[in-house]
Amino acid sequence: MGKAVKMGIVASLKALKNAEISIPEAIIVGTGLGCLQDTEKFLTGILDNQEQHLTPTAFIQSTHNTVAGQIALNLCCKGLNFTFVNGATSFESAILEAKMQIQQQFLQNILVGGIDEKSDYTYNLYKLEKIIKSENQAPFSIFDATTQGTIFSEGATFFVLSDSLTTDTYAELVDVFFVNKTQNLNDFINHFLSKNGLSTDDIDLLISGRNANLDDVNGFDEVEKIFSASKIYYKHLSGD
């Protein structure tokens, strides 16, 4: 069992336990890269064995929907089982799908999560392409970024979305909205808030995804200037 599967099963079980739900009606997962370690293991096997005498195990466990499938097998859940692979917005896509399923009254509760793992070969390639930072560039600061690349990390997070308020409810998910490209961040944010009957002055706290990538500094600066509310940051602790 790969690391991504292990993380996914543990995180999903904890989420279900907190929600006091044994079997969800659906499982929706978002992943940007899938089970990288098993993917590399399978591809390495192809090269080492000259494309002969390969066992299918590593290939089966390398597919992007492996985590959602293994969670369903572990729970004996026969409901809807979706996996979204949409780059940096994979988790957001999963959340949006779950929200629409509940809003349209198709389902009453859904286990939804996001997961990604690190692997040695991909990690080294990303460093060469300056997508992530090298260890010799440490310490990394998200407030004073001077180099390209983000802080690479891995992990799993799961939530249970429900159509009703209970004593175990943490918060209400009001809206999810994202686009592929926007010419004006200010207009995009104000449109999102206005369609929910809000303005920037109504926001008490902004949770910023500011990272340590020099290429992203201007974008985060522009967004944070729009809000006068307090701001908190987390990627210096969790990575990207």
Which stretches of residues belong to each language-model region?
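Short, well-ordered, mixed-charge alpha-helical segments that flank or form enzyme active sites
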Residues: C35-D38, S90-A94, K118-Y123, T182-Q183
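Acyl-CoA/ACP chain-elongation machinery
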Residues: F106-L128, T147, D175-L185, S208-V217, ...
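Condensing-enzyme catalytic core mediating Claisen C-C bond formation in acyl metabolism
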Residues: Y126-L205, A229-Y233
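Solvent-exposed alpha-helices and their adjacent loops that cap or buttress functional pockets
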Residues: E20-I21, Q52, L75-C77, I102-Q104, ...
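Active-site-proximal alpha-helical scaffold in enzymes
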Residues: I9-N18, A72-N74, F82-G113, E154-T166
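Conserved beta-ketoacyl condensing-enzyme motif
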Residues: M1-Q70, N74-N81, D116-K118, K195-F227
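Conserved active-site and cofactor/substrate-binding residues in soluble primary-metabolism enzymes
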Residues: K3-V10, S22, S62, T66, ...
